[in-house]
Amino acid sequence: MKVDLSPLNGIISDKAFQKLKSINNPSLVHFLSKTIELTTPDRVYVSFGEEKDREYVKKRALETKEEIKLKMEGHTIHFDHPLDQARAREDTFILTDEKIPFVNTKPRDEGLREMLSLLKGSMKGREMYVGFYSLGPRNSKFSILAVQITDSPYVIHSENILYRNAFEDFYGDKPFLKFIHSKGQLDIKKRRIMIDVKENTVYSVNTTYAGNSVGLKKLALRLTVTKAVNEGWLSEHMAIVGFEGNRGTHYFTASFPSGSGKTSTSMLGSLISDDLAFIKEIDGVCRAVNPEIGIFGIIQGINERDDPVIWDVLHKPGEVIFSNVLMTDDGGVYWEGSEVEKPEKGYNYEGAWTKESGKPASHPNARFTSPLTSFSNLDKDYDNPQGVVIDGIIFGVRDYSTLVPVTEAFSWEHGVITIGASMESSRTSAVIGKADVLEFNPMAILDFMPLSLGKYLNNYLTFGRNLKYVPKIFSFNYFLKDENNKFLNSKEDKRVWVKWAVKRVESETDAIYTPVGFIPYYEDLSKLFNSTLGKQYTKEAYELQFTLKLSKYLEKTERIMKIYSEIADTPIEVINELKAQKDRLLDYINRYGDKVSPFQLVKS
């Protein structure tokens, strides 16, 4: 079937016209022409990912003042609206006529009417930008094609950093995900993000914050989760990182809610992904790739001592977009928690700023955007079309009172259900609302869940049953506090928990059986603290960190059981696994009381 490009004649450049003609993709042309007709831009720039396209987009970002050039070569800064600083949960909808627990839905016809009304003529007086990308390594079993349309050069610049340009891969009538964004008038009351799963299309308007506007980031995750569940693989909010053991590199995926340790964990080994993972069973083995080739990371708290790899990226020439940090008068940047001297004045997302105002210089959800190739710890297989074999899965939370620093699950089912599906974590600044409220957030993906948790978990359990080699599952918690509200661990201690997990993967160390999983022996951690961090690890510290608060674990298990018992399609395995854990906890409470020291468990 020959593609009809007549609707685009005279609207796009001759070069773009000929290139689109060459790939013969009617669905793509239809999508472009309909979006142009809806949004009525003055001009359309079709970016094919060539160097001159990338340079043009960067130039336009500066000309439109969506970005400002900084003194370091390649560095720019972007400011979002003061009320558009994080993912907008309340303005984000899955378009479906179903009512889905924990999912913000809107009837599809109603949502489309509202969205198309907001987008109508939204690009008048502006230039439209079109980009073509692949989520995952190009021409691989993992690759998913996507098209972004936007009137924001900052958005398309971000996507050129974060994703693989892949125009040539659209040859023929290949399916692709569709993303339409307009900054509109930045009327926050009319900010809307709507995900039409049925048509694999996401609409976004009156916002520029990347989590709401960069389509291939978390907006695409809703579409790829749906695709994964329907096809029997996993699309996850997970880092992928390689950790060295005595038998070579072991790759782990790591799921943490935003701002809870995912990026810092991904910097402890060889980096493949800091945020997202496509995971498939290939010949009975669990393999994963990064859909992205860049990082959109939280910058608050990044300092030279704790985060040397990221610090280096942010202080050398190269492509970096800072967002919502402080810009100093000399074209430098400052962010809270950087542990450098705070400047006297500058400019941030609220306008002119002075130290004497007492206000924070940067937003707690301020970000940086950089290509993976800028990171010194980048793994050689970061773009391997075959992916990497996954030996372990980490589910981490920000839990101040209950979970011990590290636990290993008894099995795939036990780990998926009592660790991953039971995650509760304190809310962070990455979402709009009150911080430090404990939230149910299974697999750290609830914000991006487009379907029933029951269906999602059933796919997880089925996926595990199809594996011949099953990764071990671990619970991590870097944020446990004592009764005086002081953290029980330093930032660097996470290196030890990782080392212990690697030793468990290599079957090099035993562990203590508890009702909630396996925990480390003191002697093993003492050796690891010495060899990894060069510091002494006391029995007192170990006991404080690994004493199991049985009553609190029981309360948590009962909370989670209640949640899943009220979801109609929850697999029976979920309830049975949680009930078995509850029974074990009741048995231990009967034997030991509300708490039990790990030393008591060793003696028993």
UniProtKB/Swiss-Prot annotation:
* First-tier enzyme category under EC: lyase
Lineage, top-rank taxon, reads Archaea
SUPFAM superfamilies for this protein: PEP carboxykinase N-terminal domain, PEP carboxykinase-like
Report the Pfam families cross-referenced here: PEPCK_GTP, PEPCK_N
Record's catalysed reaction(s)? oxaloacetate + GTP = phosphoenolpyruvate + GDP + CO2
Q: So where does GTP get bound?
A: G259, S260, G261, K262, T263, S264, R367, R398
Decide whether keyword Mitochondrion is in the record: no
Positions that bind substrate? R87, Y209, A210, G211, S258, N365, A366, R367
Matching entries from InterPro entries are given as: PEP_carboxykinase_C, PEP_carboxykinase_GTP, PEP_carboxykinase_GTP_C, PEP_carboxykinase_GTP_N, PEP_carboxykinase_N
Cofactor (UniProt): Mn(2+)
- State one molecular function term (GO): GTP binding
Compartments where located: Cytoplasm
Cofactor-binding details, from the entry: Binds 1 Mn(2+) ion per subunit.
Q: In which pathway does it act?
A: Carbohydrate biosynthesis; gluconeogenesis
Q: Which residues bind Mn(2+)?
A: K218, H237, D275
Establish whether keyword Cytoplasm is in the entry.
yes
Q: Which GO terms describe its biological process?
A: cellular response to glucose stimulus; gluconeogenesis; glycerol biosynthetic process from pyruvate; oxaloacetate metabolic process; propionate catabolic process; response to lipid; response to starvation
Record keywords: Cytoplasm, Decarboxylase, Gluconeogenesis, GTP-binding, Lyase, Manganese, Metal-binding, Nucleotide-binding
What's this protein's family per the entry? Belongs to the phosphoenolpyruvate carboxykinase [GTP] family.
What does this protein do, in the record's words? Catalyzes the conversion of oxaloacetate (OAA) to phosphoenolpyruvate (PEP), the rate-limiting step in the metabolic pathway that produces glucose from lactate and other precursors derived from the citric acid cycle.
Protein name as it appears in the record:
Phosphoenolpyruvate carboxykinase [GTP]
> What is this protein's gene name?
pckG
